Amino acid sequence: MKFTAPLHAFTYWEKNNPDQLMFHQPFAQGSVKTTYREAGIEIRKIAQALIAMDYAPKSKIALLSKNCSHWIMADLAIQMSGHISVPIYPTINANSIAEIMSHSDSKAVIVGKLDNYESQKSGLEGFTKIGIKAYQVEEKLIWEDMVAQNEALTDVPEQNPEDLLTIMYTSGTTGSPKGVMHSVGSFNEVTNTAVDAIAIKAREPRFFSYLPLTHIAERIGIEMFGLYQGGSFNFPQSIETFADDLAATQPDLFFAVPRIWTKFQDSILHTIPQKKLDLLLSIPIINNVIRKKIKKKLGLLNTQAIFTGAAPISISQLIWFKRLDIDICQAYGLTEDCIRSHFNLPGQNKFGSVGKPLAGVELKFSPEDEILIKSE
């Protein structure tokens, strides 16, 4: 199925696979599972509540939260209400939050799962705040009350390719955070390109979302890719439960920055020292058993596509994981190009490179040897 916009994808799965699990959200007291039908009702009610707040069409609504089911529901509700999302990194300080709220001209903010909201709250003074009680965020407006008090929106607007969908602020590694304006069309094109390039063979694919959804790689590679595939989204409860939560999920696609791969490698070698691992992998009868046990422990037993990016990774480390049947594909992209750039792909992986241009991408070098990227 070829979709034309994020809401087209969501409403398709909501209608055609309503009982498919959409979210598995762990809490300290237990996990909450939400189907596409149940999520749709909640999203539509929040969208109706946002419309009732009577902001001008295409107003900016900020989103301050760590990854969780409510992050994605809020994103879809903002789209359904005809507004534009402004995700904010959940770890930045109050001054930076205030700057982004002002610069983006955001009218309101949805506040969800955070480590220390009290230290950030002053950055939201003067703005309408919607708190999510499930994450102990108490504000004048409460998400759960809005769900209880509103009817579900029935008329979902059609999204046009040229419509502004979101303003994504860069992490600031190249200076002050810059607000990158992405349209419905740019999100749709890159997601459809990724779906065509990365063949996930699973009837109900599973995804594990832990890198910030405010980052373009997670926003496209997990949220949008998973949404277009009609998959389920799983999240870690905390850093302490990360390994167990990932192992319980066994996702079909996984993305990690190089420092995560180093942690995985250290964890494996702590359990099986290198000399012992070399010996076990050299024994034909045992090596496949060892590989499967390691992959299952990591949560990568069923993973069909594994990616890394955002920083360099050594060829020696890629080769080390390859011996364990973990084929890590390096990719390259920017917030500014909506990560539609260069990818190694499963079965076409060349270590020491970031792969070939994706379909529709053109590349050249400037006289100063800058990489210039253009896409449709």
What feature does the model see in each segment?
Residues 115-161, 268-297:
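ANL superfamily adenylate-forming
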Residues 22-68, 72-76, 93-98, 102, ...:
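Conserved AMP-binding/adenylate-forming core of the ANL superfamily
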Residues 188-206, 213-293, 302, 327:
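Conserved AMP-binding/adenylation subdomain of ANL enzymes
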Residues 254, 290-376:
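Conserved AMP-binding/adenylate-forming
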Residues 33-37, 165-191:
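Conserved AMP-binding A3 loop
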Residues 60, 66-86, 90-94, 102-108, ...:
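A short helix-loop-beta submotif of the ANL/AMP-binding
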Residues 53, 76, 80-145:
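Structural core segment of the AMP-binding/adenylate-forming
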Residues 18-21, 150-169, 176, 200-206:
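Conserved pre-ATP/AMP-binding loop-to-beta segment of ANL
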